[in-house]
Swiss-Prot record:
InterPro entries: Aldolase_TIM (IPR013785), DAHP1/KDSA (IPR006218), KDO8P_synthase (IPR006269). It comes from Wolinella succinogenes (strain ATCC 29543 / DSM 1740 / CCUG 13145 / JCM 31913 / LMG 7466 / NCTC 11488 / FDC 602W) (Vibrio succinogenes). Keywords: Cytoplasm, Lipopolysaccharide biosynthesis, Transferase. Pathway: Carbohydrate biosynthesis; 3-deoxy-D-manno-octulosonate biosynthesis; 3-deoxy-D-manno-octulosonate from D-ribulose 5-phosphate: step 2/3; Bacterial outer membrane biogenesis; lipopolysaccharide biosynthesis. GO terms for biological process: keto-3-deoxy-D-manno-octulosonic acid biosynthetic process. Its EC number is 2.5.1.55. This is 2-dehydro-3-deoxyphosphooctonate aldolase. The lineage of its organism: Bacteria, Pseudomonadati, Campylobacterota, Epsilonproteobacteria, Campylobacterales.
Length: 263
């Protein structure tokens, strides 16, 4: 089972290391293909005043230290084509943010790297239409069709993170997991699926109570892995605190997901 876990954004080297240390038992489980994640820049924050992160250069340096100390494989998201080359030197997965999932130049540039490309499904997207985004990456890597086998072979993944449900709310249509899994390995991101975009007055809200049940539901439907943002103190997190769960809660959840995956 693939597990991508870590904080929403890089806050400090000390906090990054603290969270990474808490996740070490999960990384050592032979049943888990573990990736540590964190963003160097949250480029689509609701408010101009919201914390965005340390930026590309410093952020990659900080992630590199985590890789060196813990031996973790890494994921970070990119927003512009010129970020790809530098990010690909440090991380193992380049993530295309949901709002940018149709951006051809960004997908193609990411696919030119040696990193896995994880494309997050836009909240506004029909899951079936994500095959076009997948095919952009597949063709860039010399493939010819959007199929699960081809995408897996070429390292192209999709992530489900909920769909817009009116203003300031998201809902998960579990059918999308089956639909998208026809043409790519699928990761389920429950922590962003429980987000309430822009609902907290200049920033997004959320309800982390639903992270575990939605994750278990996705495991029952069938997915290739899970993306879960975690923080030692979600209430004090500088971004997406209401959606995140603690490392302790994540450990409990992962054992449940492993059990469900074996059914």
């Amino acid at each position: 089972m693939i597990l991508i876990a870590g904080p929403c954004v890089i806050e400090s080297q000390e906090m990054l290391r603290k969270i990474a240390s808490e996740l070490q038992p999960l990384s050592e489980d032979a049943r888990i293909d573990f990736y540590f994640k964190a963003s160097f820049d949250k480029a689509n924050r609701t408010s101009l005043e919201s914390y965005r992160g340390p930026g590309l250069e410093k952020g990659l340096e900080m992630l590199g230290r985590i890789k060196e100390e813990f031996g973790y494989k890494l994921l970070t998201d990119i927003h512009e084509t010129q970020q790809v080359a530098k990010a690909a030197q440090v991380v193992d997965i380049l993530q295309i943010p949901a709002f940018l999932c149709r951006q051809t130049d960004l997908i193609v540039e990411a696919a030119k790297s040696q990193s896995i490309v994880n494309i997050k499904k836009g909240q506004f997207m029909n899951p079936a239409d994500m095959s076009h985004s997948v095919l952009k990456a597949i063709k860039t890597r010399g493939g010819s069709e959007a199929s699960y086998e081809e995408a897996k072979r070429l390292g192209i993944w999709l992530t489900e993170r909920g769909s817009s449900f009116g203003y300031g709310n998201l809902v998960v249509d579990m059918r999308s997991l089956m639909i998208m899994r026809q043409f790519a390995p699928v990761i389920f991101d429950a922590t962003h699926a429980v987000q309430m975009p822009g609902a907290a007055g200049g920033k997004s809200g959320g309800d982390s109570r639903f992270v575990a049940p939605l994750s278990r539901a996705a495991a029952a439907v069938g997915v290739d892995g899970f993306f879960t943002e975690t923080h030692v103190s979600p209430k004090e997190a500088l971004s997406d605190g209401p959606n995140m769960i603690t490392p302790q809660a994540l450990k409990v959840l992962v054992h449940q997901l492993l059990a469900l995956s074996e059914i």
